[in-house]
Amino acid sequence: MSITSKPVQLVRFRWDLSAIPAEAGQLSKPFVLRTAGPNEIEEAMAIVLASYNLDPEWSGCALHIKDNVLPGVKRALTKEPTCLFVQHGNRIIGASVYDCAPEESEVHLVSGACVQTEYRNRGIGGALLASTLEALKARGLTEAFGHTRPNSPSAKYLCPKFGGTKMAPVVAPPPISAAAA
């Protein structure tokens, strides 16, 4: 007997990139923001996966993460190195993968601002989000879209930063492995 899971509910956010403040993505020392290199796909995937797995808001969404988020990360990074890392010393503690030209119905903020749990609530997620939006703006985009869980701390506090406006809720596509079952 197979166990059916409820569809993953998401909320979509939109940012007008012309309204992003110029100095929004500043990080305080000892944290360093840098662009990930083309050979760092595995590191980006590991940070994104750990961030989602350890976030209680994404509990019960393992198939969505495995079948939708991680392939989106890999697709975006295979096209070009569009990932920002936050480092603390030699350790990568945060990542944000973005796609400048997503497929229809996809989002620009593929992973969102993923920060290791022990480094959260220090302004790192906000700086990572702002820097990602600035990177998209620098590539000529005028607006960006992203998804998160409804009523989560990211939906309440992070995504509204820098002019993020909540749009209609969406249901994530069914995971590939669930559809095949």
Question: What is the meaning of each model-derived region?
Answer:
Residues 1-30, 173-174:
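Acyl-donor-binding surface of acyltransferase catalytic domains
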Residues 136-148:
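Conserved GNAT acetyl-CoA-binding A-motif
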Residues 44-52, 73-76, 136:
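Hydrophobic alpha-helical core bundles mediating ligand binding, dimerization, or RNAP-core interactions
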Residues 115, 121-134, 138, 157-161:
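Conserved acetyl-CoA-binding loop-helix of GNAT-fold acetyltransferases
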Residues 1-6, 126, 150-168:
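Conserved active-site alpha-helix within GNAT-family acetyltransferase domains
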Residues 56-113:
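A conserved beta-strand-loop-helix scaffold within acyl/acetyltransferase catalytic domains
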Residues 161, 165-181:
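…primarily DNA-binding HTH/wHTH and HhH modules…
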Residues 32-46:
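A short beta-loop-alpha structural element at the N-terminal edge
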